Curated annotation (Swiss-Prot):
Formation of pseudouridine at positions 38, 39 and 40 in the anticodon stem and loop of transfer RNAs. Substrate binds at residue 111. Gene3D superfamilies: Pseudouridine synthase I, catalytic domain, C-terminal subdomain, Pseudouridine synthase I, catalytic domain, N-terminal subdomain. The lineage of its organism: Bacteria, Thermotogati, Thermotogota, Thermotogae, Thermotogales. The active site is at residue 52. The gene is truA. This is tRNA pseudouridine synthase A. Belongs to the tRNA pseudouridine synthase TruA family.
C-alpha cells in the first residue's frame, strides 16, 4: 500500500463545502465515492484545507493510501477522473512518503479572490466572481492591505466559532492586481487561515476601496479584536483555493 497525493480542482457552486456531511453533496463525499468505485473499498482522504459552501479550488491537495501497488500515477488519475462528476477534476497524481498529510505539511496556501467592477453583469462568469459594479480606489486598498501583512490576531476577520481556537495567523503576501476590463484579483498568501478569514479581508478592503473607510480603519478593525467592527464577509463564489505549496 502506497501513500498517494493528488492535486485537483473543483467548481464549488453545487457543493455544501469540502468536508463530508450527511445528506448533502460535498467535495470530499464525491471524491471518496469515486475512490470506492475504483478500489472497491472505502478510502479515507486527508485534505490541505476545507473550503466553505460555494468556494472553488484550482489546486486543492489530498492524500490517501492506495490499496493497489501495481497502478502508476497516470492510471490512478484516469481511473478516478472517470468516476468523478463534471465539477471535480484530478490534475496531478504522485507517490509520496507514507505519512504525508497535506494539512500539516503545507508550507503556504494561496487564495485568489476575483471582483468584477464592470457596469454590466457577465452571466458566464457570475459563479466565479463577485460582481460589484462600483469604482474602487485600488491604491487606497493597497495601503490598507499593508496593515494585514505579518503575524497578527485575526479574530476580527473570522467567522463566529473561532473564539476558542488560536487566532494568531501570518499573512506572507497580500496583493491587489488589476487584470483587465474591471476585473480585480486579490491574492492572499499564508501558512493557514481562520474560517472566513480571506472573505473578511476582501470585504474590509472593498469597504476602503469605495471610500466609505480610510485605509487606517482596517488597522483599527485588526487591533480591536472585535468581529462586530468588521465589514463582514465577501460572497463565497469569488474565492478560490488557488495553490498549496509544500
Amino acid at each position: 500500500m502506497r501513500r498517494v497525493a493528488i492535486e485537483f480542482s473543483y467548481d464549488g457552486t453545487d457543493f455544501f463545502g469540502y468536508q463530508i456531511q450527511n445528506n448533502v453533496r460535498t467535495v470530499q463525499g464525491e471524491l471518496e465515492k469515486a475512490l470506492e468505485k475504483v478500489f472497491k473499498i472505502h478510502i479515507d482522504t486527508y485534505a490541505a484545507g476545507r473550503t466553505d459552501t460555494g468556494v472553488h479550488a484550482n489546486g486543492q491537495v489530498v492524500s490517501f493510501d492506495c490499496p493497489n501497488d501495481r497502478l502508476m500515477e497516470n492510471d490512478i488519475k484516469n481511473a478516478i477522473n472517470a468516476n468523478l462528476p463534471g465539477d471535480i477534476y484530478i490534475k496531478k497524481v504522485w507517490f509520496t512518503h507514507p505519512t504525508f498529510n497535506p494539512r500539516y505539511e503545507a508550507k503556504r496556501r494561496i487564495y485568489h479572490y476575483y471582483i468584477d467592477t464592470s457596469k454590466s453583469k457577465n452571466l458566464f462568469t457570475r459563479r466565479y466572481v463577485w460582481w460589484f459594479p462600483y469604482e474602487l480606489d485600488i491604491e487606497k486598498m493597497r495601503i490598507a492591505a499593508k496593515y494585514l501583512i505579518g503575524e497578527h490576531d485575526f479574530i476580527s476577520f473570522s467567522k463566529k466559532g473561532e473564539e476558542n481556537t488560536k487566532t494568531i495567523r501570518t499573512i506572507n503576501n497580500l496583493r491587489i492586481i488589476e487584470i483587465k476590463n474591471g476585473l480585480i484579483l486579490i491574492r492572499v498568501e499564508g501558512i493557514s487561515f481562520l474560517r472566513g478569514m480571506v472573505r473578511s479581508i476582501v470585504a474590509n478592503l472593498v469597504r476602503v476601496g469605495t471610500g466609505i473607510w480610510e485605509p487606517e480603519k482596517v488597522k483599527e478593525v485588526l487591533e480591536s479584536k472585535d468581529r462586530s467592527k468588521s465589514a463582514g464577509l465577501a460572497p463565497a463564489h469569488g474565492l478560490f483555493l488557488y495553490k498549496v505549496l509544500f
